[in-house]
Amino acid sequence: MKLTKILLGALLLGGFTACNDIEQADRYEPIEVTAKKNVLIEDFTGQHCVNCPKAADEIQRMQADSTIGEHVIAVSIHGGSMSKHDSETSGLGLATDEGETYNSRWNVKSWPKGLVDRTGGLQDYESWNASVVSRLAETPKVNITADKVAYDEETRTLKLVTSVSGNADVTG
């Protein structure tokens, strides 16, 4: 019995000395992403939502990322029970009728949630980065370029001239 304890102790001691000491920077190998498109994140949020600032921070972090940032487009949509309307807040509410329609359409029941390029359904903000990286690696079926953009502030009219070129055959 004593010999077993000694052997077990020696094995454990030997096991600890066999461990490699890997520096923190060497433990993670980032995957290079060559963005071929832009990705839209629709962030369902609300002024009563206590975790929604974390989702906003995640979007800000992605947009600050030198590899993917310029390809991440985010839209915050206020609607549902976590949002405030102007009538509730003396004109300071951010909820809109359109936001309510989007929340209803996507059946948002908890916040924050988001859609990444409207694929994969509603996601928690912790999943957005992986979804964005995955979508950025895809080749878009078409390239859309805004050739001329003109916005008239007085009439709130946007005029946009675009050109579209195909990258793949599309049927249907």
PLM features: residue spans?
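Non-globular targeting/processing and membrane-anchoring segments
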Residues: 18-31, 133-172
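Structural recognition of the beta-strand scaffold that forms the well-ordered cores
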Residues: 40-43, 73-78, 112-117
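Sec-exported extracytoplasmic/periplasmic mature domains
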Residues: 54, 60-68, 119
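Extracytoplasmic/secreted envelope proteins and their assembly/folding machinery
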Residues: 56-60, 99, 129
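Thiol-based oxidoreductase modules, predominantly thioredoxin-like and allied folds used
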Residues: 68-97
